């Protein structure tokens, strides 16, 4: 199968050019002008449009069971939504398994979830929920099998203490893996939450007040120091929501420490006032939404290069689940927001079209740097001969208002309802196959492939 994309502006992280793009058998074969492929081929006219590498979302939670509820997106509905939003690869954060389970247990469970369902290519981050000799011995074998990143938690049921974190950092570093971490100070959060509950203060606003930015920033600073103690182990901070944490990361990077950080559209575009609305419970996520001042600090990091990746932390629970389980108490509400379908459009509209970032920086944040950090480059995140034919075409002339009824996940609401975006996803191709076109999903369940990722190699800081 041959596909020729003509008359568009092809953009990579290192530059852009008005040129044509030829995909053959799922692989990019040629870029240039006046390409004359062998017949037969499909021709796509991208006049006036940007032709970007397909998005790489390295933070999703499909099929996750958090004990009190299971997310309403599985690997079909979740990856369908991703495809319709221009994302062609996801790396899913596996949820916790049974107490005492091995790393391989969760990998087998999640491969079972995704097989025959995923629409786009996918991989997983391992999750380390406890430390013992068997787990430490298992890590190198998992890296050899293509899992080159693992997540630690400093909060929730399977939080690790400092000694366990150090053991994990050392072994992951030795094994060629990248440590990712959810950084929040669990003890401080528990104390604040208990105070509010004892006082009968259980409205959504108290979720944010029980998890102040200092809880997140302290944990970020602690992880940076522990990574240094562990032999300058590489570290990736997920879902950054505040400027103080970013300051600590800037300092670490100035000291040549290998640290990277992601943020999410919700921390750039939503703020804590959402908790005071009638539907405040729909915005319960951790870390919580912050104030507009923190948004501005994150946008500075997006613009000046201090933030490396924009992912989603897509974790969907319906409003029915939230209301039934929480009964008006923030501490009982399952955490997470949908957003895998909106990431690319929101960042393009609020970043590129406002002049905050260039189209090249857009590629770096949404596909190139995620692919490089997580062992997928240059197969993903790049449009060059030999790379996968993963493409998203965005028309900057079109304006769209986000409406839940037009989205493709399995949620019953969207936190982005009513947002007007300048720029529309008009087509998504995965390995040369059109899986979304002009508002219609055209992919098939099970066509996505499991990606064995390469060991971690740090990009140049």
Curated annotation (Swiss-Prot):
Carboxylation allows a single lysine to coordinate two divalent metal cations. GO terms for molecular function: hydrolase activity, acting on carbon-nitrogen (but not peptide) bonds, in cyclic amides; metal ion binding. The keyword Metal-binding applies. Binds 2 divalent metal cations per subunit. Its EC number is 3.5.2.-. The modification N6-carboxylysine is found at residue 151. InterPro entries: Amidohydro-rel, D_phenylhydantoinase, Hydantoinase/dihydroPyrase, Metal-dep_hydrolase_composite, Metal_Hydrolase, Metallo-dep_Hydrolases_sf. It is an enzyme of class 3 (hydrolase). The keyword Metal-binding applies. Its cofactor is a divalent metal cation. One of its GO terms (cellular component) is cytosol. It comes from the Bacteria. Pfam families: Amidohydro_1 (PF01979). Gene3D superfamilies: Metal-dependent hydrolases (3.20.20.140), Urease, subunit C, domain 1 (2.30.40.10). Keywords: Hydrolase, Metal-binding. GO terms for biological process: pyrimidine nucleobase catabolic process. Substrate binds at residues 156, 286, 335. A divalent metal cation 2 binds at residues 151, 182, 239. A divalent metal cation 1 binds at residues 59, 61, 151, 313. Belongs to the metallo-dependent hydrolases superfamily. Hydantoinase/dihydropyrimidinase family. Homotetramer. NCBIfam families: D-hydantoinase. Catalyzes the stereospecific hydrolysis of the cyclic amide bond of D-hydantoin derivatives with an aromatic side chains at the 5'-position. Has no activity on dihydropyrimidines. The physiological function is unknown. This is D-phenylhydantoinase.
């Amino acid at each position: 199968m041959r596909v020729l994309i003509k008359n568009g502006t092809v953009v990579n992280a290192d530059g852009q050019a008005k040129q044509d793009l030829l995909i053959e058998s799922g692989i990019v074969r040629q870029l240039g002008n006046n390409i004359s492929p062998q017949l037969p081929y499909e021709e796509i006219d991208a006049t006036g449009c940007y032709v970007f590498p397909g998005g790489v979302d390295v933070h999703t939670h499909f099929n996750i069971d958090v004990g009190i509820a299971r997310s309403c997106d599985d690997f079909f509905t979740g990856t369908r939504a991703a495809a319709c939003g221009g994302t062609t690869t996801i790396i899913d954060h596996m949820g916790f398994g049974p107490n005492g389970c091995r790393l391989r247990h969760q990998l087998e469970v999640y491969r079972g979830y995704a097989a025959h369902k995923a629409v786009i290519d996918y991989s997983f981050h391992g999750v380390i929920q406890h430390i013992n000799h068997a787990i430490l011995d298992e890590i190198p074998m998992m890296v050899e099998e293509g899992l080159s990143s693992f997540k630690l938690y400093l909060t929730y049921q399977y939080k690790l203490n400092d000694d366990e974190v150090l053991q994990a950092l050392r072994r992951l570093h030795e094994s060629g893996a990248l440590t990712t971490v959810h950084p929040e100070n669990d003890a401080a959060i528990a104390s604040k939450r208990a105070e509010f509950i004892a006082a009968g203060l259980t409205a959504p606003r108290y979720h944010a007040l029980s998890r102040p930015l200092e809880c997140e920033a302290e944990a970020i600073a602690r992880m940076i120091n522990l990574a240094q103690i562990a032999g300058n182990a590489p570290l990736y901070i997920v879902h950054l929501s505040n400027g103080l944490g970013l300051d600590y990361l800037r300092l670490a990077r100035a000291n040549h420490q290998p640290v990277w950080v992601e943020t999410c559209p919700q921390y750039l575009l939503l703020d804590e006032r959402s908790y005071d609305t009638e539907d405040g419970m729909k915005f319960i996520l951790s870390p919580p939404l912050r104030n507009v001042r923190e948004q501005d600090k994150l946008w500075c990091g997006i613009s000046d290069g201090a933030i490396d990746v924009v992912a989603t932390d897509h974790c969907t629970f319906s409003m029915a689940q939230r209301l039934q389980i929480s009964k008006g108490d923030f501490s009982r509400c399952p955490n997470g927001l949908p957003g895998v379908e909106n990431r690319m459009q929101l960042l393009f509209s609020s970043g590129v079209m406002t002049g905050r970032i260039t189209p090249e920086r857009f590629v770096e944040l949404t596909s190139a740097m995620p692919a490089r950090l997580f062992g997928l480059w240059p197969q993903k995140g790049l449009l060059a001969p030999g790379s996968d034919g993963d493409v998203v075409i965005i028309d900057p002339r079109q304006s769209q208002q986000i409406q839940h009824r037009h989205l493709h996940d399995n949620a019953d609401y969207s936190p982005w309802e009513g947002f007007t975006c300048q720029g529309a996803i008009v087509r998504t191709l995965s390995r040369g196959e059109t899986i979304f076109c002009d508002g219609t999903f055209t992919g098939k369940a099970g066509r996505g492939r499991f990606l064995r990722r390469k060991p971690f190699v740090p990009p140049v800081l």
